[in-house]
């Protein structure tokens, strides 16, 4: 059961850096719905992409799976036999709840839930990889190496879904979308104190990139095609395609 997010409703004397701990995991479904515009749409459409790209006898990776929302969306939409989903997160609290969520919904496609560092996971025989608001929590210097590894592990015709919070090279546009996101959180019941305290905790651990920077990394990794397929304010999702025809 998810609880309402009130983690930052009272002043916190010492704000440390953000962690996906037990307290965050407990309120995460409410938190992300009220904080990330378009999140439900992205989750639903990841399932639609899975229906299009997942191939029989291949694997799907959900890297930074949190509570398993993207994993479940993929599994509901797989139309082939002998597929497997590997869901990975480094937060013990998230993984514990993810396993419970996955087990609560029965489906023929098996899911392996792994507690671990996504940088250490071997990607192989993949028809689809999902990075749903995950890359932004890696050090910028480590992001290219992960994308390189994903590209190598994808089969020809495979797809990477990369959802992120964006920064903008045009400062005026960036300010507008930042303020609209602020309005979105206020409209969802967050106070100025809650918004400010959460932002202070995230600013050192969530480092955002522009869409242009993401596309440049994807090209460098080898992806022949990439495009923004969803955006709401300063949040969105890209799809990157590996050339070739799925076997």
From Swiss-Prot:
It is an enzyme of class 2 (transferase). One of its GO terms (biological process) is tRNA wobble uridine modification. The keyword Protein biosynthesis does not apply. It holds the Pfam family Methyltransf_25. Keywords: S-adenosyl-L-methionine, Transferase. Signal peptide: none annotated. Its EC number is 2.1.3.-. S-adenosyl-L-methionine binds at residues 39, 64-66, 89-90, 117-118, 132, 199. Belongs to the class I-like SAM-binding methyltransferase superfamily. Cx-SAM synthase family. PANTHER family: CARBOXY-S-ADENOSYL-L-METHIONINE SYNTHASE, TRANS-ACONITATE 2-METHYLTRANSFERASE-RELATED. HAMAP family: Cx_SAM_synthase. Homodimer. This is Carboxy-S-adenosyl-L-methionine synthase. It comes from Salmonella newport (strain SL254).
